[in-house]
């Protein structure tokens, strides 16, 4: 005798999935859900179905959403830099993907102690990056020499060799701190624009 197929589960009401992302404990909404920029974009898309913008705003939006970063790991901070790109923090969801070549990179993360011997190599790699280029100084050693500040062979901050846009403090800074520095860099790019820097 054939068995009857139970289809009672198909009549269950559909339940919407919970919003994904970092939830703000104060509001219970994902972080950035009340950002006026995104709200105005959503309203304009709902009204017209398309967006009107300037070329500069479009280029800035594209640039902040597709920053390619190059590692310049010199010491222990490089471990936290690698941790930021792993699945737990997943920097690529913010459009921040790693590249191996300076000619394909927009951002250089200097992580660790910069010595006098390594300074010319840092400058050479920085000069190979296309414009506009940005530098994140990660950790106390890259920011100002750190623990080895008084050593004869240490550069007291990578800003003496290349211009730095964002400083991430700590010894070593956590992956969350570096990710916050990346978000600050994206905010700085949006604020500064692309035509003039």
Curated annotation (Swiss-Prot):
Its EC number is 7.1.1.-. GO terms for biological process: aerobic respiration; electron transport coupled proton transport. Belongs to the complex I 20 kDa subunit family. It comes from the Bacteria. Disulfide bonds: none annotated. The lineage of its organism: Bacteria, Pseudomonadati, Pseudomonadota, Alphaproteobacteria, Hyphomicrobiales. NDH-1 is composed of 14 different subunits. Subunits NuoB, C, D, E, F, and G constitute the peripheral sector of the complex. [4Fe-4S] cluster binds at residues 76-77, 141, 171. Binds 1 [4Fe-4S] cluster. This is NADH-quinone oxidoreductase subunit B. Gene3D superfamilies: 3.40.50.12280.
